[in-house]
């Protein structure tokens, strides 16, 4: 367990580092061993560990990947941090409701623990968040108590490398009330035989608003979310990774668009991150019906859609 011995106990263990119940091979999407956490992991040491291990990773779609499901029970939201997140993303503040994207923030430290581990086959450095699909089955109270579960669902070949899918679930009791699938891409040399999701072809969406993004938006989002990836913080740290300036967090761009669009209480959200947004900068939020985009000139940075779940009351758009 290494650095995590103080915040982790595997189900079925004796509390002294025993093996998790049910450990062994498991197929994608099946139940693997569960590791129960007593608190959310700290992101900074995970980022450091993942960075140090990255040069030794040899990514491939056929690689083994961790089957463990990390579980954090008894989760309650820090309302001050939530308010800071709502302000930086443009959501209403002070309501007893979680923004549709906020459970991703809660689950991200658990995902990082998996992706920074020795048994995760892809290098954390250079791993690109390419898309997210979120399903919220009902409105989530900010004052509620939840159980959070995160696991790696599988690897897939991509013409530019290898993709990994990471699943996050939020439960109340036995019921899944929110879930997401995030895809991340590790770029490496391939035979270009891997698949890539086909994008829906449609004309440009009508512009709704022009947003001038300040140079500190990455630092403000990092303070609210805990995601302090250096590419988002300052031009000097971004240049170390090949960017001329700091870039906006992909999940900030998605959250900002969804705050502007609004979402039904029971909703399916899809967002694809297509190009980085350099900071400071000016972008156009465009939308038509269910679809939305964030554009800079002729370049689409983010595209996505908001879809009411069938069989649920679509009245009363919330964020």
Please identify what each model-predicted range represents.
Residues 133-135, 183-185, 210-213, 272:
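Generic structural detector for well-ordered beta-strands
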Residues 2-7, 12-14, 19-131, 191-264:
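Hot-dog-fold acyl-thioester-processing enzymes
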Residues 288-319:
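C-terminal domain-closing interface element
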Residues 179-183, 210, 270, 303-306:
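Well-ordered beta-strand positions in beta-sheet-rich domains
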Residues 130-173, 266-300:
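Hydrophobic beta-sheet segments that form the core/acyl-binding groove
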Residues 76, 217, 225, 275-277, ...:
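A broadly conserved detector of short glycine/acidic/proline-rich loop/turn motifs that flank catalytic sites
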Residues 165-172, 176-192:
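Flexible glycine-rich active-site/ligand-binding loops centered on an Asp-His dyad
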Residues 141-143, 189-192, 220, 238-240, ...:
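A broad, structure-centric signal for solvent-exposed, well-ordered loop/edge residues
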């Amino acid at each position: 367990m290494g650095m995590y011995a103080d915040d982790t106990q595997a189900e079925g263990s004796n509390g002294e580092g025993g093996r998790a119940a049910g450990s062994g091979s498991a197929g994608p999407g099946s139940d693997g061993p569960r590791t129960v956490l007593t608190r959310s992991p700290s992101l900074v040491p995970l980022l450091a560990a993942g960075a140090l291990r990255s040069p030794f990773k040899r990514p491939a779609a056929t690689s083994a990947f961790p089957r463990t499901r990390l579980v954090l029970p008894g989760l309650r939201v820090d309302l001050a941090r939530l308010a800071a997140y709502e302000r930086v993303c443009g959501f209403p503040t002070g309501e007893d409701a979680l923004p549709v994207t906020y459970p991703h923030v809660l689950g991200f430290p658990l995902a990082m623990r998996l992706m920074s581990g020795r048994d995760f086959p892809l290098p954390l450095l250079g791993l690109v968040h390419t898309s997210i699909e979120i399903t919220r089955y009902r409105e989530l109270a900010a004052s509620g108590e939840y159980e959070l579960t995160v696991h790696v669902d599988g690897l897939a070949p991509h013409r530019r490398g290898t993709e990994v899918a990471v699943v996050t679930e939020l439960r109340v009791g036995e019921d899944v009330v929110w879930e997401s699938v995030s895809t991340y891409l590790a770029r490496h040399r391939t035979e270009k035989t891997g698949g890539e999701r086909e994008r829906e072809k449609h004309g440009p969406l009508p512009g709704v608003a022009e947003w001038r993004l300040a140079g500190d938006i990455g630092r403000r989002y990092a303070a609210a979310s805990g995601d302090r990836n250096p590419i988002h913080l300052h031009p000097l740290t971004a240049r170390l990774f090949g960017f001329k300036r700091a870039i906006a967090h992909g999940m900030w761009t998605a959250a900002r668009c969804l705050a502007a669009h609004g979402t039904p209480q029971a909703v399916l959200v899809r967002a694809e991150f297509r190009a980085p947004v350099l900071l400071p900068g000016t972008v156009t939020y465009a939308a038509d019906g269910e679809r939305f985009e964030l554009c800079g000139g002729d370049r689409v940075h983010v595209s996505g859609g908001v879809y009411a779940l069938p069989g649920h009351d679509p009245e009363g758009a919330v964020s």
